[in-house]
Amino acid sequence: MTFINEILKYNSLSIVGLQKNTGKTVSLNYVLDRLPIERKRIAVTSIGIDGETTDQVTRTHKPEIYLRQGMYFGTSEMHYRQKRIVSELIDVSDENTSLGRVVTAKALTGGKILLSGPSSSSGLKRWMKDMHRVGIELVIIDGALSRNSLASPAVSQSMILATGAAYSTNMNTLVQQTAFVVDLIKIPLTEEANLKLLMPIEKGVWYIDDEGALHELSNISSLSQDFRFEGMDRCKTLYVAGALVDGFLEKVRKNPKLKTCELVVRDFTKIFVSPQQYRLFLKAGGVIRVLQKSKLIAVTVNPTSPLGVTLDSDTLCAKLTEAIHLPVYDLMKDNVDVCVPQTYKTNSVCETQTHTMRCN
């Protein structure tokens, strides 16, 4: 069953969109509809707000989220009150969001729901841990790739990336940018000693010397353009807890004292550098590592932009597959092996395979 069987190998999955309207919610519904809930306990939540009928920016139609009977979910108090399903209340946490506390419940009937869960990475981790503690075997996170998001989808073991014409209607640009993001997702973990030392640190710029001692660079911000690296002759690892941007990466690349210094960020969502600067850094011998990462198992595409421009799906999928060496699926196709339930089917949500069967 395509990438569904791959998902079942992990205890958590995040589904993230390269940009709004790239088919993230369609991908989420596709996964939720096909998971074997009769033999797997599943919970779902969202980093942002998902399940709205209209995009608040483009004012275009959005697919709603449909939960099946027996699935667990975490959402804010505000959106829990707006649910259109019968549910059993499991927990009301101390985790506060702008829309109230996070409510965890079990769907007793299938139906539509708005999701807005934990708003920070630490809160998301706690919720996931609580779910696993009560016997949930797979946690699904509706994720976000945004500098404004305090919660990272990279806390999950596995990931699906949704891309599409909403990002760019130029196919080559879309393929190149998607391939770049895939490269970032695949950045390896740093060594175990660094993980233990750096994981608790959530702010600032730090370095580890050749004796394993940790030092804070209190005079440096990763977002500042006016700073100098001083007293770092023995730097072995340079850690940026916040956002990594072009200016900072360029200064690291041009500093001869940091030639052998491994650059570490929390995860790929903290990297906001251009492909050009990233490749220059690697070409100069630079090494980037992360503290947490997810296994990217598939990429989905939405070839139609909110403005109505449609790219050729077969060509786009072929070019992406060649560029990233991963399965690429167009879930918007009319020909699929399985269709979504009629109860929430507003558009045909489908999948391209080498062999296809007609939807009924």
Positions of PLM-derived features:
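N-terminal phosphate/diphosphate-binding loop that engages ATP/GTP or pyrophosphate donors
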Residues: 31-106, 316-317
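Short, basic, glycine/proline-bearing loop/turn elements
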Residues: 12-19, 106-117
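Conserved catalytic-core segment of NTP-binding enzymes
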Residues: 120, 124-138, 143-323, 341
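Charged/polar low-complexity intrinsically disordered segments
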Residues: 342, 351-353
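General beta-strand structural signal in soluble alpha/beta enzymes
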Residues: 43-47, 116-117, 138-143, 161, ...
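Walker A (P-loop) phosphate-binding motif
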Residues: 2-47
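A generic structural motif
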Residues: 46-47, 262-269, 327-337
